């Protein structure tokens, strides 16, 4: 059986060369809101230059926002994909003052043995939806935090790509089949609050937002997702409905139900979560 993390790593390695930054408009919005929240909260705290762990640094977009605020801050920036780490390193090659340690690792494995009380702030932008074991991983992250430290992150919510899921479901029902989820199953705000409380966080704040994006067609929408490395699916092939037929039928339903003047619409639901 294929390891899902290996497939995810391969997808993001392919997108690191440039296609990710071109297509990641929603992730940029999430990063800007995350940075704004962190800066506002930190300005009221004690640590003006916190020691930071960034999980899922990608090409370094969010890392750059942190450095623009704190030029001499100490950051450990971790990512699963080696090509993403390489791209991020190149982004900061000319910033000699930057105190960044880049680390290629799966956070869910790395976190098991990483030292306690190591960071003032743990941040992550548009990454935690990829966690296979969020409860265990969040528990480890809580252990990393020094007294008074916090975990602040954005992630995608369950209503992300709701049009796509509805279109697929209609096709499955038309063939008398149980719908499968094409994409990730992600946690809701209530589920995240439960996970964080179980890990020992006492102050938890969740903010939800929805962003609508338009694409020329369902095919263009899926190409954009693939260009960002986010084409992983939990669905498996079914006898009697080939992938080609399934997708062609889905395209028809999508265009019929979610057509707009400029193409088709796709919903992104994202969550901004603070835990301290």
From Swiss-Prot:
InterPro entries, A to Z: BioC, SAM-dependent_MTases_sf
Alphabetized CDD domains for the sequence: AdoMet_MTases (cd02440)
A Pfam short name: Methyltransf_23
First-tier enzyme category under EC: transferase
Key words, A-Z: Biotin biosynthesis, Methyltransferase, S-adenosyl-L-methionine, Transferase
Pathways involved: Cofactor biosynthesis; biotin biosynthesis
The protein's Enzyme Commission number: 2.1.1.197
Family: Belongs to the methyltransferase superfamily.
Summary of the function given for this chain in its UniProt record: Converts the free carboxyl group of a malonyl-thioester to its methyl ester by transfer of a methyl group from S-adenosyl-L-methionine (SAM). It allows to synthesize pimeloyl-ACP via the fatty acid synthetic pathway.
HAMAP family from the UniProt entry: BioC
Protein name according to UniProt: Malonyl-[acyl-carrier protein] O-methyltransferase
């Amino acid at each position: 059986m294929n390891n899902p993390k290996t497939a995810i790593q391969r997808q993001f390695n392919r997108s690191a060369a440039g296609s990710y930054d071109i297509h990641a408009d929603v992730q940029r919005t999430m990063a800007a809101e995350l940075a704004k929240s962190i800066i506002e909260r930190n300005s009221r705290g004690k640590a003006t230059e916190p020691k930071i762990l960034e999980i899922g640094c990608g090409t370094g977009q969010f890392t750059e926002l942190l450095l623009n605020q704190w030029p001499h801050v100490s950051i450990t920036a971790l990512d699963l994909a080696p090509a993403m780490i390489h791209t991020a390193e190149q982004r900061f090659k000319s910033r000699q003052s930057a105190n960044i340690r880049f680390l290629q690792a799966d956070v869910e494995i790395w976190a098991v043995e990483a030292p306690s009380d190591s960071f003032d702030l743990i941040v992550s932008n548009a990454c935690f939806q990829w966690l296979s074991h969020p409860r265990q991983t969040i528990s480890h992250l809580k252990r990393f935090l020094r007294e008074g430290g916090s975990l602040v992150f954005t992630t995608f919510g369950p209503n992300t790509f709701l049009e796509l899921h509805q279109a697929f479901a209609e096709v499955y029902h038309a063939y008398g089949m149980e719908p499968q989820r094409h994409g990730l199953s992600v946690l809701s705000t209530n589920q995240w609050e439960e996970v964080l409380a179980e890990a020992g966080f006492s102050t938890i704040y969740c903010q939800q937002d929805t962003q609508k994006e338009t694409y020329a067609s369902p095919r263009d929408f899926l190409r954009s997702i693939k260009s960002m490395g986010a084409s992983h699916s939990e669905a498996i092939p079914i006898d009697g409905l080939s992938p080609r037929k399934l997708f062609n039928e889905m395209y028809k339903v999508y265009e019929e139900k979610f057509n707009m003047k400029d193409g088709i619409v796709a919903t992104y639901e994202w969550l901004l979560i603070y835990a301290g």
